């Protein structure tokens, strides 16, 4: 296994814009996300708090792209597992490069918390409906795919998806 290597990226961040969803000729959905991650620290010389934000280009495919387009909005917090990929193209004789995180069917996209506009409506629902949805998503995800990438896609029809995801995410922690 060490000869092949591991290419895995995990991000928890917030969307800078609404997802851009398009459909490729074979009918599959592709969504582009701009995800911001931030870290903060105290400057040793000045004592001031400092913050640095990194922007990540994330590309989702298939059902995950459709879910992102329907439920994610600017400011939403997401958990992403995917692969780092750099591609290049020629732009009038200049070679351009872009690095993206690809989330295919073996990857994961989970919505954390609720969208800012849905916050008041969705809050009471997780206690009643969150646990069963998480269990259903786990069962369905195992039946349809071998990976856990489909767990986030299963709750698509229910508007209370973000709350169900919170419980599903907590259940995945092994301790």
From Swiss-Prot:
Statement: the UniProt record of this protein carries the keyword Transcription regulation: no
GO molecular function: single-stranded DNA binding
DNA-binding region: 55-61
PROSITE patterns xrefs: SSB
Spans annotated as Disordered: 114-175
Compositional bias ranges of the Basic residues kind: 141-151
Low complexity biased stretches: 115-133
Keywords for the protein's UniProt record, in alphabetical order: DNA replication, DNA-binding, Plasmid
Domain called SSB: residue spans: 6-110
Pfam families, sorted: SSB
InterPro entries associated with the record: NA-bd_OB-fold (IPR012340), Primosome_PriB/ssb (IPR000424), ssDNA-bd (IPR011344)
Compositionally biased tracts (Acidic residues): 163-175
Subunit composition and interactions: Homotetramer.
Stated role: May contribute to the conjugative processing of DNA. It has a functional relationship with Psi (plasmid-mediated sos inhibition) proteins.
Protein name: Plasmid-derived single-stranded DNA-binding protein
Encoding gene (name): ssb
């Amino acid at each position: 296994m060490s000869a092949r290597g591991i290419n895995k990226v995990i991000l928890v961040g917030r969307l800078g814009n609404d997802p851009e969803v398009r459909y490729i000729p074979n009918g599959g959905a592709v969504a582009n996300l701009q995800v911001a991650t931030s870290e903060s620290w105290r400057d040793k010389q000045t004592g001031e708090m400092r913050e640095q934000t990194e922007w990540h280009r994330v590309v989702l495919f298939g059902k995950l792209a459709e879910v992102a387009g329907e439920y994610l909005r600017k400011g939403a917090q997401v958990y992403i597992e995917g692969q780092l990929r750099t591609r290049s193209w020629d732009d009038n004789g200049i070679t351009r490069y872009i690095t993206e995180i690809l989330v295919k069917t073996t990857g994961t996209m989970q919505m954390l918390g609720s969208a800012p506009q849905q916050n008041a409506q969705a809050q009471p629902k997780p206690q009643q409906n969150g646990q069963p949805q998480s269990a259903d998503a786990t069962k369905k995800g195992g039946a349809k795919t071998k990976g856990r990438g489909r767990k986030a896609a299963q709750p698509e029809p229910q508007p209370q998806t973000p709350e169900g995801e919170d419980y599903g995410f907590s259940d995945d922690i092994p301790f």
